[in-house]
Structure formats: C-alpha cells, structure tokens
C-alpha cells in the first residue's frame, strides 16, 4: 500500500513539475510600422499669378488656387500642407495676430509649442516656425512676411487620428519640407 502511495505521489509530482515549467503567456505589446521615406529632392515652384516662389519636395503634389493658396499633398503619408497668401494692406498686426491665434488654438491638445524665429534680410523674409508637440491636429505651422506687401502662412495636417508617436516619422519628414519651403521663399 505504501509503495502505491509513493509511486502515485512521484507521478503526480513529476507531472506537476513537467506541466508547470512553461513560460507565462504575456500579451504582445502594441507596435507601430517602421516607415522609411526617400531622401527629399527639391525643385523650384513658381506660378505666373502669385508674387512668390519656393522650393518643394518632388514627392509632393501641389494644387493651386486662383488666390495663391496651395495644397501640398503627400498621398503616401496622408498629409497635406495648406499654404495661404494674403496681401499686406496696412493690416500686418491683424495678420500676425491671426497666424499666432491659429497656432495657439492647438494648445489644448499640445504638450508643447516651440517657436523658432526666421530672418533672412537679403530676401526680406521674416517669420516664425512653430513646432507643435503632442496629439494636436497639426504638428508644424509657419508664417512668413516682408511686412509691407506679402504674408504667407502654412500648416500641416494628417488625415489620421492624431497619435504623435505613430505619425512621428511622417510628421518629421513633412516638417522638414515645410521648413525648407519657408526658408526658400522669395518675393517677386
């Protein structure tokens, strides 16, 4: 009888050890797709009816409007830069206030807004580049002016729910293009 109990105990103990040695099942963490984009190649963009030119990435698709407003689309990234032109008619303070108001309307969702002044005295282009960090609707905006005749604003939007971590590679790529656009802006 004791031999049966010992044998049974050993079998139970061995089966317990064999089946309890498995690794714990852990859920897979969420991950995001790694996105690589081609190196940007820039070309000058100019129209006959607008008083400015700029350089733009060859990956972008530019659609113009009669009032010198443009949409610069990145179909692969589901992103669009919206450019708006306004002539300055003794209203520079209002234009500046409106541009700043547009940027700071995102402060509710933004973690941080970095202001980076831009000044090119040779080309008479002055402005501000804004980098909006966090889950805001836009992650980059700018305005540029000569303060007497011309005023251009730009902002980038993604056709996706704003999740800063998941759109970061595309947002960084488009932000660099938008900065290049602002820095190559020339008045006619």
Where are these regions (language model features)?
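C-terminal motif of bacterial Sec signal peptides marking the signal peptidase cleavage site
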Residues: 16-20
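Bacterial signal peptide processing site
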Residues: 22-25
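Signature of long, low-cysteine stretches enriched in small and polar/charged residues
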Residues: 100-155
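Second-shell loop/turn segments in exported
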Residues: 81-89, 141-142, 164-172
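Bacterial N-terminal signal peptides that target proteins for export
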Residues: 1-10
């Amino acid at each position: 009888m004791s031999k049966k109990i010992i044998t049974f105990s050993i079998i139970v103990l061995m089966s317990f050890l064999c089946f309890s040695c498995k690794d714990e099942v852990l859920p897979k963490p969420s991950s995001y797709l790694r996105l690589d984009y081609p190196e940007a190649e820039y070309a000058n963009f100019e129209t006959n009816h607008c008083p400015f030119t700029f350089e733009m990435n060859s990956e972008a698709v530019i659609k113009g409007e009669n009032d010198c407003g443009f949409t610069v689309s990145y179909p692969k990234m589901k992103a669009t830069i919206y450019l708006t032109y306004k002539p300055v008619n003794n209203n520079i303070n209002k234009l500046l206030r409106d541009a700043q108001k547009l940027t700071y309307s995102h402060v509710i969702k933004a973690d941080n807004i970095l202001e980076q002044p831009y000044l090119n005295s040779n080309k008479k282009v002055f402005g501000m580049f804004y980098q909006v960090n966090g889950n805001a609707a836009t992650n980059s905006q700018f305005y540029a002016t000569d303060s007497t005749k011309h005023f251009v604003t730009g902002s980038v939007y993604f056709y996706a729910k704003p999740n800063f971590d998941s759109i970061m590679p595309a947002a960084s790529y488009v932000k660099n293009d938008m900065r290049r656009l602002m820095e190559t802006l020339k008045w006619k």
